[in-house]
Amino acid sequence: MDRLKNIDNAINIMLSEMETGWTNPDTLPLKQRLMRSLINIRQPDKPSQELIDAQDKELAAQREEKGVVELRQEGIHLWQGDITRLKVDAIVNAANSRLLGCFKPLHACIDNVIHSAAGIQLRCYCNEIMQAQGHKEATGQAKITPGFNLPARYVIHTVGPIIPHGKPTKEQEELLASCY
């Protein structure tokens, strides 16, 4: 199946699951934006294998186009750039307390970017964790998930403190430190 037919398949399956009123555009870049938007708003319901296969094929093509960065030296590295390009053991996601990712279409937050590149399996997996846990994730705590369509093997989801007014309190500093 060629790329346009494949991404159309993924989009059409997700459009049929939801009532968005959105239509499938003509160009690949617009189709990619729509697919990401649909991934962003999709509830963590079990996807069909057909959807997973179509989505995974498109995300693999996008990953190849962006390029994968391999860090050959062992240890902890500081990276400035697109974290979804890193082929490492784990990347860290600044998650919300529901761990389900950002539901705002095309939002630029790291939570949205990671969930978009990992695919719908990540939200479904996080939902299973949260259902088993039975409560929101506490600030300063973390959960580890597979990376799914990311080059990284794992994603460490940690919930940081909300610091609304400039300088953090001592407690907020300690909570932030416990995240990392």
Describe these PLM feature segments.
Residues 1-180:
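Macrodomain-like recognition of ADP-ribose-binding/processing modules
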